[in-house]
Regions:
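Extracytoplasmic/periplasmic substrate-recognition and gating elements
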Residues: 51, 69, 74, 78, ...
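Short helix-initiation/N-cap motifs at beta->coil->alpha
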Residues: 84-97, 197-203, 275-287
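Paired acidic/hydrophobic, glycine-rich loop segments that form the ligand-binding mouth/hinge
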Residues: 109-112, 292-297
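Short, solvent-exposed loop/beta-turn-alpha elements that line the ligand-binding surface or hinge
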Residues: 131-148, 195, 217-220, 240-259, ...
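Glycine-centered hinge/linker elements that transmit conformational signals in sensory
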Residues: 205-210, 246-276
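Long, aromatic- and glycine/proline-rich binding clefts that accommodate carbohydrate-like moieties
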Residues: 365-416, 423
Length: 450
């Protein structure tokens, strides 16, 4: 489906001007900091101005910029935000946009970067470690980490702490769950799905939703399927994985992965889902009752064309159906310190603000399309009451989630995973041949130096 998929795909429109904050368009040079190499030795002052890239949409800008204004009032540090939205609206294109700005010497202190790009930017040598800053505020960082899912934090530290250094502190996350139209389910006498439901349960629900109507049961990603949104949920819930545990080698051609690809291809041939390729607005179709289910994290909440009250009344959220085990990918995002920043102490103050209770309780969902990573916030009734039933599943799923991080030549790897999966869904390649092609191509790409 054509979606505004939050941490995986953004709207093409950028930030709108809002009172109290200066926001530049995506093609305008950001202003407010020097591109010279700063040592980070000077203390932050009220005269500091940070230039930071934010992946937020126009409808989210008012709340987000209000919290930036709160940061400025507390610290005296101003933030000039610019949009990292691009025409193609993928993380790959966002990383390219940021890289181009940095290579061109444009002033930029930081930008919100998803897990997939962390290794990429570290390997390019454009980041400063956070270690000395963390050491100075160890108690505050420890308090924050004590409020993060232990499983997710352990996986993050294992895979994203690079060469013994910390370059990111995660502030938000997303997993993959099923959003379902409760009104459609109820009208057909279908029970609400519950955690632990199976692939068979899912397929049977799709069949009933489509029977004798023009409705579709489920939406697959268009114009191309995404690895995080369309591939990983199916292979992980069958005990498979595109990469091995430490994500150093491709395992795409495993029997579990081929079985998962076969299952999704059967959904296509049975006409239970939209046809691959082209365009399909799953959020709009589901809102209108023309679609029973679609996959996502928390980000669809701001993309569904209904009021929040209508979203809460219409939809429910449940973990992904499983074949052999529960499973979901998880990705996080955070702010690094670019070497070119002349305002590093001030930027560290901003990073600390993003892990604070105040920030986590407010704009994280809107700001990056992510769940707040503090579990005291994400599991609180004051937070959950604002969203559809089942939102608590996002926190529950962290216990068995698989962290998806960047790999060598990551942009090309993600493109190949999408391409091979699409060929399977369209019937251009059999599931076994398609997954073998993915295996061969991804293995080759991961061995290339870029």
């Amino acid at each position: 489906m054509t979606t505004e998929i939050g941490r995986r795909r953004f709207l093409s429109t950028g930030l709108k001007a809002a009172a109290g904050a200066a926001v530049a368009g995506p093609l305008l040079a950001a202003c407010g900091s020097s591109a010279s190499s700063g040592s980070g030795s000077k203390a932050s002052t009220a005269d500091d101005v940070l230039t930071i890239g934010l992946p937020i949409t126009p409808q989210d800008s008012k709340q987000t910029l209000a919290y930036i204004d709160s940061f400025t009032k507390q610290t005296g540090i101003k933030v000039n935000a610019f949009t990292t939205n691009t025409a193609t609206n993928t993380w790959v294109s966002v990383f390219q946009e940021i890289s181009t700005r940095l290579a061109g010497g444009e002033p930029m202190d930081s930008a919100y970067i998803a897990t997939e790009g962390m290794l990429l930017f570290e390997q390019r040598g454009v980041l400063d470690p956070l270690d000395p800053y963390i050491a100075k505020d160890q108690s505050a960082v420890n308090e924050f980490y004590s409020d993060v899912s232990p499983n997710m934090l352990a996986n993050f530290r294992k895979l994203d702490d690079i060469n013994g250094h910390t370059y990111f502190i995660p502030i938000g996350y997303n997993v993959m769950s099923i959003w379902y139209n409760r009104k459609v389910f109820s009208s057909l006498g279908l029970p609400d799905p519950t955690p632990g439901w199976t692939w068979d349960d899912f397929q049977n629900a799709c069949a009933k939703i489509t029977s004798g109507s023009s409705r579709l049961g489920f939406a697959i990603g268009t114009p191309v399927p995404g690895p995080f949104t369309d591939v990983y949920p199916w292979v992980l819930t069958n005990g498979g994985g595109i990469l091995n545990a430490d994500q150093t080698a491709c395992t795409a051609n495993s029997p579990q992965n081929i079985e998962a690809a076969t299952f999704v291809r059967n959904l296509v041939t049975s006409k239970l889902v939209n046809q691959p390729g082209g365009s399909y607005n799953g959020f709009a179709a589901a809102a209108a009752g023309h679609l029973g289910m679609f996959g996502g994290g928390i980000w669809p909440n701001s993309g569904i064309p209904l009021t929040q009250a209508e979203v809460n009344q219409t939809f429910g959220i449940v973990p992904w159906p499983q074949k052999t085990q529960p499973g979901t990918p998880v990705g996080v995002g955070g702010f690094p310190i670019f070497k070119s920043s002349a305002n590093k102490p001030a930027l560290w103050e901003f990073i600390k603000f993003t892990i604070s209770q105040e920030f986590q309780a407010g704009p994280v969902v809107n700001f990056g399309g992510d769940m707040p990573i503090r579990q005291s916030v994400a599991q609180s009734q004051s937070f959950l009451k604002n969203f559809p039933p089942g939102t608590e599943s996002f926190s529950d799923e962290l216990a068995y989630s698989t962290m998806i991080v960047g790999v060598p030549n990551g942009s090309a790897v993600e493109t190949e995973i999408s391409t091979a999966w699409e060929q399977i869904l369209t019937g251009a390649a059999s599931p076994s041949a398609g997954m073998q092609s993915m295996q061969d191509q991804v293995t080759q790409l991961m061995q290339q130096t870029v």
